[in-house]
Each structure stands twice: as C-alpha cells, then as structure tokens.
From Swiss-Prot:
Protein name: Small ribosomal subunit protein eS10
Sites of Omega-N-methylarginine modification: R153
Natural source organism: Mus musculus (Mouse)
Modification after translation (UniProt): Methylated by PRMT5. Methylation is necessary for its interaction with NPS1, its localization in the granular component (GC) region of the nucleolus, for the proper assembly of ribosomes, protein synthesis and optimal cell proliferation.
Coiled-coil region(s): none
Biased composition (Basic and acidic residues): 97-128
Length: 165
C-alpha cells in the first residue's frame, strides 16, 4: 500500500522502541491511538505490520478484535538497518528489568512477618475442618442417597414411552 514515508518511519520507530505493536481491527479509524500525535491512520499501521509479517519480521496474534505483533530477531535487525540505529539500542522487550531499589522493608518479631488470614482463607479453613466430622466414613455417605427404589420413565417426550407397570 502506498503511504507517506514519515508514517512508515513513525510506525517502525514505535515498533522498535516498544518491541510490540497493538492495533484494533478497524480500517476506518482515523488515527492509531499510540501515533495520534503524528496523525497516522490505523489502516497504515495494519498494512505496514502486514508487510513486516509477510517477510517474517513480526509474529502476529489476533484476539478480541485486536492485532498483536511481536518483533522477531530478524525484524530487530531489519529495523535497526532501516532506521540507521546503533547496535546498543534494543527494544523494550529485550531490556532486563531492574529489581526495585526501594527502602528495605521492616522485619517483624523474630525476623518473620506475622501470619495473617484474610477473610476468605479463614472461612475456607473452618469449612474444611467442619465438613466431615472425625471418624466419619465419606464412602458410605456417597452415592444415590436414601432412595433405594428407582423408577425410569421414558425419555423426556421422545417417543411414546412405556405404560406404567
């Protein structure tokens, strides 16, 4: 599809920076939400990504009316060459997440945190303890119950059925 080079470059830059691209399956959407400041239509994003997919530079997933594209290693190399980027710059999906360097958490008595029950856990534990009294036989209680005589009465309106005996 013919599209302005500035739109293609804006799409490729965002894809390389994030490592992923998401687009709603709507060809009539006037602007892609992440590229609204550059005035890029959603159709251009979909077609540029379709082109990259056909060359094997992105993997495509589709769910709930949204396309999800993930860069492959070949796609990273292609975009690096196309956008003239140095090898030190990598997409956000390949960067290591640094552990949080917040303040140290205070320790409780004996260096451990006290055990806390939320409402759901406490209810669940009491239910499990009181469900079967100690010494009761679960297998004797399982089964059809107290009804010892069964009656089978035809098949829910299919056919005439048998007369009662």
């Amino acid at each position: 599809m013919l599209m302005p080079k500035k739109n293609r470059i804006a799409i490729y830059e965002l894809l390389f920076k994030e490592g992923v691209m998401v687009a709603k399956k709507d060809v009539h959407m006037p602007k892609h939400p992440e590229l609204a400041d550059k005035n890029v239509p959603n159709l251009h994003v979909m077609k540029a990504m379709q082109s990259l997919k056909s060359r094997g530079y992105v993997k495509e997933q589709f769910a709930w009316r949204h396309f999800y594209w993930y860069l492959t290693n070949e796609g990273i190399q292609y975009l690096r060459d196309y956008l003239h980027l140095p090898p030190e710059i990598v997409p956000a999906t390949l960067r290591r997440s640094r552990p949080e360097t917040g303040r140290p958490r205070p320790k409780g008595p004996e260096g451990e945190r006290p055990a806390r029950f939320t409402r759901g856990e406490a209810d669940r534990d009491t239910y499990r303890r009181s469900a079967v009294p100690p010494g009761a036989d679960k297998k004797a209680e399982a089964g059809a119950g107290s009804a010892t005589e069964f009656q089978f009465r035809g098949g829910f309106g299919r056919g005439r059925g048998q007369p009662p005996q």
